Amino acid sequence: MNVQRTFNRRTLLTGTVALGTVGLLAACGGSKDDKAGGKAATNAEDLVNNLQINKQDYSSLKKGGELKLSVSALGPDFNTMTQSGYTSSNLEAVGGCNIPATMGFYNLDPAGEDSMNKDFCLEYKVETKDGVQTAEYKINPKAVFNDGTPVDVEAVKAYWEIYKGGGDSGYSIIPNPFWGQIESIEAVDGDKFHVKITMATPYYLSEVIGTYAAHPALIDKELFNTGFVDKPLDKYWSGPYKVGNWNSSEKTLTLVPNDKWWGEKKPLLDRIVWRQMDPDSYRAGFKNGELDAITFVGAATYNTVKGQSGTDIRTGQRTNVDNLQFNATRVTDLALRRATFAATDREQLAKVIYSQIGWEEPMPGSMLAMPFQKGYEDNVPKNSGADAAKKILEEAGYTMSGEYYQKDGKTAGFAITTFGSDATTNAKFQNLEQQLKKAGIKVTNDNQPDANYNSVAGTKSYECLFNSWGVGANLADSAQYFYTKDINNGVGDDEIDKLVAKISETESKDEQIKLANQVEKLHMEKVAIYLPYANGPEYTAAKSKLANYGPSLFRTTYTNAEYWVNVGWQE
């Protein structure tokens, strides 16, 4: 599969993420059979020190120039705080234009460590006294939204207002439990840039909490939920780039330097042009010079772009987990979901995607962590195979009728939504279709255009799909973004919700990790919504003189505010 659908919930987390060990992509480059190659390993120091991004000093790069890039879908909702707007494509394209809401006041480095972004935050401290946890920080008084509204305590309160009510608040958000634990947010001694947050109960998952902000106008629910549909309203944003033009009919977004940007580093590029393209189009676009760089994971793209004059292929480890994902409000029978997971041969699915490029990796068993991260455990149920799946269905009252099981006159089955016409995507569906048929489960292919992904996934207009989520650097913190009833539209388990709540109340980091793994094991057995089957590599084909751009582990274009100001062209 050459286009990976990726969400990364890290931008909704509360702050610092713990340092995890990172993986080394070994034996990269051309092999004897001319595959992209690569193997997941565990040498953190070598990987972080040898990122393939054409690293260059900011001061040595050309001032000016244009960078032409593509994503699989732009919009239609450009508010990256909403369920439908929060997609990797939108974050990639506009996340760096809205730093306070997308990545907050801290930057994430390749190894997963946070550091203060002094363009927004000058001082920070958190402490717990007599059981009461407080955080205080000073916002850079130069920080403003593009319409001149200050980024101050009112902006932090606005973010709190939007998220504190969870999924029942009337805002179309991905719920974030942390914000509901805040008791108060106030200015210290009347200074609107000196913020104090008091927690109702201590929150121990992070040493940096509450360092996000939203334009106060976004408290208006209509503006928040629908105001950004086909309208990238950057007057409510703040960052080094702003929107120069949005061409809705051509699906082209042009970013230009923000004249209101106060940061020490100014953008190097005159323009970043984003275009919505499907795999065939972006492969051709790179080959004919219409694009300056493309990111991919599949053999078809590699075979198209390899050996092109004036370009190179930069290789890295994806910090993602590919998964089979149910919408449990549509596929409501737990037995059917559990049987599907039992019948799925995950190794075969991974081979469909990665064997053609010669990539090797251990089978992932978690949505919460990469196999090389501290605390990782394989939490996928071990009772698998067609016979195990049949037993689950029969114990739930299903009986075989012809080739498939039935219950109450309904065939055991569901639709899998796929996107585009990529050969690997089709092969993956066909592979899973045959696997499930052996267990008496019938699946159909709800194939849709690539451009529909954002709206379909964001509004959960599917029964099941092949998805991919970004992996956070803090295993324990990630559990709340996958395994609560609130995050899964009311589907879940009360015992699991209590365990998730206990994680943030537990001070010991080791105990947090143990609880998070316990949560994941229980959820896969008792709820069965996410089934991981691959992590995979990441390749970027780029023009050779493009600097500071390429696979960077946990440091992405939407987790590090310095990313885009450092991207430029060598003379």
Where would I find each of the regions flagged by the language model?
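N-terminal lobe/hinge region of extracytoplasmic solute-binding protein
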Residues: 67-128, 161, 236
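Ligand-site clamp/hinge motif
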Residues: 257-304, 442, 450
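Aromatic- and charge-enriched surface segment that lines or borders ligand/interaction sites
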Residues: 123-169, 194, 332
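Alpha-helical secondary-structure segments
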Residues: 68-71, 151-159, 192-196, 240, ...
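Ligand/substrate-recognition segments at binding pockets and active sites
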Residues: 248-250, 399-471
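Surface-exposed binding/hinge segments that line
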Residues: 62, 68, 136, 173-222, ...
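Detector for C-terminal structural segments
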Residues: 18, 25, 344-375, 424-433, ...
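Gly/Pro-rich hinge or "lid" segments in bacterial periplasmic/extracellular proteins
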Residues: 88, 99-100, 107-111, 210-267, ...
